[in-house]
Every structure is written in structure tokens, then in C-alpha cells.
A protein has these predicted regions:
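Nucleotide-activated chemistry modules centered on ATP-dependent adenylation/adenylyltransferase
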Residues: 1-233
Length: 233
């Protein structure tokens, strides 16, 4: 299962015994890669990018990984979207016009500087979007960029492949909303109504954390609740 992904990982293992993994905490791709990398490398530093820090719905996944894999550690940094949100006052957060915006590439370099680790792994798949498909197909094995030292082992796989691996290996199930079958963006989708309803039902303290930082999010729920009381036309 995921044999091509393992071959990609094995190639990098010949070059280093420690890697960075950009880990979304509750996402299926991250759960799969964390399991695979922990078995191949001496040290795996997972970088979790948050939009709201301290959400239990995400922290529980990080605790799971640290407990299950002794060679896995986590560092948390603001998500690149957080800098943009802060700069422009998205969803009512306190605007910080002087805030510098960061790209994922820049955050990767910051993580490298803090850890001293060069090779970075990501859960990107060609099936995610056209842009990712075009990008990934330019790399060796459609997965390895030796120039930037970035690796995408799941490039050729689909969501169902990751879910099958999770089931077969009896890993923790990724976060899924109650209103749909899609897995969410692990604490990033703060304006997604399904995600907000999921938090209200399962992790109300996390919802409070989001509203404290992005107060206009509460209006989305207010409008939803109001519409639920209106007669169907």
C-alpha cells in the first residue's frame, strides 16, 4: 500500500536521517505521512501552522502523534494565511497594517533555520488542484524537487488511498464534519459554515477561541440560525 510513496521516502532516506514534515494535525495526508516518515527517519519535526492557537480539536492529534511516535516532535508557527488575515483585519480581527506577509516557501526556510534540517515533506497531491498537478509533474518521480529539497510522496495518490492506509494501519481518523463527508483544513477553515457547526457541536471552546480572535465569524452562525427558523418557501 502506497508503495510509490515509500520508494520516494526511501530515496530521501539515503540522503538524510532527519526531515521536516508540514503537518496539518487532523488532516488525512498528514496522518499518513507522519506514520510513514516516523518509520524511515531517525528524527521527524512536524511543523503545524495555526490560524488560531490552542484549539483542542487540533492539539489532540498532535498529542496522539507525539505519543505514538517517540522520534516525532512538533513546532507551531502561524499559518501564512494568518499574516494576511492580521494585516487586513479579516473577519473582524485586529488589523495590523504593518504586518509582513509570508509565503509557505518563506515559512519553510524559517523552519529549516530553527531546526537545522534541510529536507521538507508536504502532503500535496496532484488530485488536489490543477496547479498542484502541473507543479508536481515537473519533479523527479513527480514527487521530489532536489533543487529546493522539498518532497511530496503522496503526489500520485487520491484521498481514498490515504483513507485506506489509515484504516489498514489503524491510525487515528482525520477530522470530519457532521454535516458533510469532507475533511476540513485542520483549524484553518474559520469561515467555513460546516466547520463552525462541527466545532459548536463537538468543540465549543475552540469555537470561542475563533470568535475571540475573529469576531465576525459569529455572524455567520447567527445568520445560519436565523435562516433555520424561517419557513421553507
Amino acid at each position: 500500500m502506497l508503495e510509490e510513496a515509500q520508494k520516494v521516502i526511501d530515496k530521501i532516506r539515503e540522503l538524510t536521517d532527519e526531515v521536516i514534515l508540514f503537518h496539518s494535525a487532523s488532516g488525512k495526508d498528514s496522518i499518513v505521512l507522519c506514520d510513514m516518515l516516523s518509520k524511515s527517519f531517525r528524527k521527524v519535526v512536524c511543523v503545524y501552522m495555526y490560524v488560531v492557537k490552542g484549539m483542542e480539536s487540533q492539539e489532540m492529534y498532535m498529542r496522539y502523534a507525539k505519543t505514538k511516535y517517540p522520534n516525532v516532535t512538533f513546532m507551531q508557527v502561524p499559518h501564512y494565511a494568518w499574516y494576511s488575515y492580521a494585516k487586513y483585519g479579516y473577519m473582524g480581527c485586529v488589523p495590523r497594517p504593518q504586518m509582513k506577509k509570508y509565503t509557505l516557501a518563506e515559512l519553510t526556510d524559517i523552519a529549516r533555520g530553527k531546526t537545522g534540517i534541510e529536507w521538507a515533506f508536504f502532503g500535496f497531491k496532484q488530485s488536489d488542484s490543477l496547479n498542484r498537478r502541473v507543479m508536481l509533474r515537473t519533479y523527479e518521480d513527480e514527487a521530489i524537487n532536489y533543487k529546493t529539497k522539498k518532497v511530496y510522496p503522496l503526489s500520485k495518490y487520491k484521498n481514498r488511498d490515504c483513507m485506506e492506509y489509515i484504516k489498514k494501519m489503524s491510525l487515528i481518523h482525520p477530522e470530519t464534519t457532521e454535516n458533510c463527508n469532507k475533511t476540513q483544513s485542520s483549524g484553518v477553515a474559520i469561515s467555513d459554515l460546516d466547520y463552525l457547526l462541527f466545532l459548536r457541536s463537538r468543540f465549543p471552546q475552540d469555537l470561542k477561541l475563533i470568535i475571540n480572535e475573529y469576531p465576525l465569524v459569529e455572524r455567520l452562525l447567527y445568520e445560519y440560525d436565523f435562516n433555520q427558523t424561517q419557513p421553507t418557501k
